[in-house]
Amino acid sequence: MRHLWLLLLLCVFSVQTQAADDDYDEPTDSLDARGHRPVDRRKEEPPSLRPAPPPISGGGYRARPAKATANQKKVERRPPDAGGCLHADTDMGVLCPTGCTLQQTLLNQERPIKSSIAELNNNIQSVSDTSSVTFQYLTLLKDMWKKKQAQVKENENVINEYSSILEDQRLYIDETVNDNIPLNLRVLRSILEDLRSKIQKLESDISAQMEYCRTPCTVSCNIPVVSGKECEEIIRKGGETSEMYLIQPDTSIKPYRVYCDMKTENGGWTVIQNRQDGSVDFGRKWDPYKKGFGNIATNEDAKKYCGLPGEYWLGNDKISQLTRMGPTELLIEMEDWKGDKVKAHYGGFTVQNEASKYQVSVNKYKGTAGNALMDGASQLVGENRTMTIHNGMFFSTYDRDNDGWVTTDPRKQCSKEDGGGWWYNRCHAANPNGRYYWGGLYSWDMSKHGTDDGVVWMNWKGSWYSMRRMSMKIRPFFPQQ
């Protein structure tokens, strides 16, 4: 049964194939070179007839005379003097022309005259028709001429109007060139002289300011008498106002200025880093990060004390000393450009000395910002996330490469690409010392090296959002009541 079905299918396929082959038409002869050319409606315009001129009118040949038929009798033509009446005496011959003779002569001449008159009437009618057409054409030409005359007159009026306007403009330009431009030149010359003097004054002021800024900036404000080893000791001694104080962690070193936060979470915080307005450049070398830079505090509404923190980095030597005095906790606070705030608190925070490249260690995280220092960027997974962990890293600046990016290319360095000094791995999940971007959001084409070099905390806002404010504060760890 299966073999029968296969044989049937083969027969059907053969018949269909033969039928398909029969459907092909025989090839047609090639187009005759002198034949028509079909119009391609997709590419060509359809052919159109040209308008024909009117036929020529007027007189021509006269009508042809009718030919005599064979059975018609041939009329004997006789001279006029042979057509008169006969005399009674045949010998006398033909009489002189009489009424009968004149009548016959007139009858003989009437037919050709009527034919000529009819032909003349036709010619007159043709001339009349032609004259009528000519008159109409002349009338049309006359109307067109009148319209052209009116148009020419209108154009002359427009030309006269524009000529008047152009003349007024020419007079105005002449007056402006002759009167106003010299005056304006004198005014501009005076303005340029004034600008030149202002520029010279600004250059002098800039030179003086640059000379003034060669040394660290100082703040003119009163410093409280109360002091201590750090801000926690100061608050225990009665210093309850958040402002700039003098601390002396060790009697072997001179006291130095710090800003103490006496309000946040029971106070006693020593501010070691603060970003708030981009007024200080954090893209610095190793030595400035070692010693510290920026403005510790500023006056608040012309008060005598410095109640507002400035933008600064306290200095790695000072931070290392403060954290190695005993157990230290770290509080990192940040604020976006909408005013929302989060924080990251680490119960343990230590920075080693310069010989150990200021190695950092943190633990005991809690907070709302995300554990960027210990866990790395939460958006990444696996090895990529591990590369962004900061805990255990050495401190790096663009002139001292200690990051975790192992490469022989000196251009590939985290501190160079990310805008500041920090405990970079390869490279960061947090970048508090990065470039300050107003407005928060920024993109790779806005950055210097096409990298996320802003004031970043990836676990909260990602790589391409720079914080409005970020501060780092430390305090000796002690049990809270």
UniProtKB/Swiss-Prot annotation:
Give coiled-coil spans as residue ranges.
149-213
Q: Which InterPro entries match?
A: FIB_ANG-like, Fibrinogen-like_C, Fibrinogen_a/b/g_C_1, Fibrinogen_a/b/g_C_dom, Fibrinogen_a/b/g_coil_dom, Fibrinogen_CS
Top-rank lineage group of the source organism: Eukaryota
Residue numbers spanned by region Beta-chain polymerization, binding distal domain of another fibrin: 35-37
Q: Where is the Fibrinogen C-terminal domain?
A: 222-478
Q: Where is the composition biased (Basic and acidic residues)?
A: 31-47
Give yes or no: UniProt keyword Glycoprotein.
yes
What transmembrane ranges does the database entry give? none
Q: Give GO MF terms, alphabetically.
A: cell adhesion molecule binding; protein-folding chaperone binding; signaling receptor binding; structural molecule activity
Signal peptide from the UniProt entry = 1-19
- How is the polypeptide modified once translated? Conversion of fibrinogen to fibrin is triggered by thrombin, which cleaves fibrinopeptides A and B from alpha and beta chains, and thus exposes the N-terminal polymerization sites responsible for the formation of the soft clot.
Naming one, the record's GO cellular component terms include: platelet alpha granule
Q: Could you tell me which residues belong to the region Disordered?
A: 22-81
Going by the UniProt record, its keywords in alphabetical order are: Adaptive immunity, Blood coagulation, Coiled coil, Disulfide bond, Glycoprotein, Hemostasis, Immunity, Innate immunity, Secreted, Signal
Q: Which GO terms describe its biological process?
A: adaptive immune response; blood coagulation, fibrin clot formation; cell-matrix adhesion; cellular response to interleukin-1; cellular response to leptin stimulus; fibrinolysis; induction of bacterial agglutination; innate immune response
Q: Where is this site: Cleavage?
A: 34-35
Q: Which residues are glycosylated?
A: 384
Q: List the disulfide bonds.
A: 221-306, 231-260, 414-427
According to the record's subunit comment, the protein's assembly and interactions are: Heterohexamer; disulfide linked. Contains 2 sets of 3 non-identical chains (alpha, beta and gamma). The 2 heterotrimers are in head to head conformation with the N-termini in a small central domain.
Primary role: Cleaved by the protease thrombin to yield monomers which, together with fibrinogen alpha (FGA) and fibrinogen gamma (FGG), polymerize to form an insoluble fibrin matrix. Fibrin has a major function in hemostasis as one of the primary components of blood clots. In addition, functions during the early stages of wound repair to stabilize the lesion and guide cell migration during re-epithelialization. Was originally thought to be essential for platelet aggregation, based on in vitro studies using anticoagulated blood.
Free-text note regarding domains:
A long coiled coil structure formed by 3 polypeptide chains connects the central nodule to the C-terminal domains (distal nodules). The long C-terminal ends of the alpha chains fold back, contributing a fourth strand to the coiled coil structure.
Q: What is this protein called?
A: Fibrinogen beta chain
